[in-house]
Amino acid sequence: MAAASTSSPVISQPQFTAMNEQQCFYNESIAFFYNRSGKYLATEWNTVSKLVMGLGITVCVFIMLANLLVMVAIYVNRRFHFPIYYLMANLAAADFFAGLAYFYLMFNTGPNTRRLTVSTWLLRQGLIDTSLTASVANLLAIAIERHITVFRMQLHTRMSNRRVVVVIVVIWTMAIVMGAIPSVGWNCICDIDHCSNMAPLYSDSYLVFWAIFNLVTFVVMVVLYAHIFGYVRQRTMRMSRHSSGPRRNRDTMMSLLKTVVIVLGAFIVCWTPGLVLLLLDVCCPQCDVLAYEKFFLLLAEFNSAMNPIIYSYRDKEMSATFRQILCCQRNENPNGPTEGSDRSASSLNHTILAGVHSNDHSVV
């Protein structure tokens, strides 16, 4: 008996650990991952969950209606049939999709999370990642377009419709890939020791990558708008020395500054807290990030609600089209100019070009 017991195979502790690390948990319940990460999984609706869900649904409805209004306005008004407006329509489409994705999340959160499988949970998160990535990519595309337009002194870029379509396809391809990456393998289902606390099926490394990707995009936008501001400020100062219209130059610079502050301020307020929270989830285990998760996610979603206001409502022509649509009025002169309307790609670009072109002979 003693000899038999000595001859039986014994698995050492390092071998057991290696086998455990290679094990995958595709058939486990969502509760398994949540319990292991320490994230609370509700069994019933409490006051906070109901409040978050109510706010979330309200924001979703506003996002979808506001962005639908933008898309309809660009479609019905032929003055908007230019590349910049096509990008704005695509931004509205991305934000509309964000509203749908977040709406789906609202009905599959809280106690309803327990009913999800691994695949449906990854789908739920993938929709959010795809929609938000598409929105951010569109913001970057618009910033690049504005940069090119201002530096070439054009009302509209000379980009062909085909190139606009290519840009839009690239944006959505990148967004879909970013949203699908966790589902196709970059998750912690087979690496259970490196699961995130905020997203218990997501790998820590993916969340760090996603957060840094968006923060880098933010930095690029800051650089682009800062470059535009510096360029216009230099031009207005040169024009002030050679022209009798310093007030117009000052107004142009202030209009640009206001737009830059709105754009960057909205992005900082809506996105930075959530992105920092993702990094803290990985880099600061003792930080109680789960206490703020839902509210910061809701705040990030507000960016999709603010985009139509920032990029569309400041345009006088867009505002007039909004009123016509909401009041069921016909646009009697869809091709002609409207007095007092801003027919440029944005009111910002129109004021820049108006100041530059009216004084260009004195600068050169």
UniProtKB/Swiss-Prot annotation:
InterPro entries: GPCR_Rhodpsn (IPR000276), GPCR_Rhodpsn_7TM (IPR017452), LPA_rcpt (IPR004065), LPA_rcpt_EDG2 (IPR002277). The keyword Glycoprotein applies. The keyword Phosphoprotein applies. N-glycosylated. Detected in brain corpus callosum, medulla oblongata, cerebellum and sciatic nerve. Detected in heart. Interacts with RALA and GRK2. Interacts with GNAQ and GNA13. Interacts with CD14; the interaction is enhanced by exposure to bacterial lipopolysaccharide (LPS). This is Lysophosphatidic acid receptor 1.
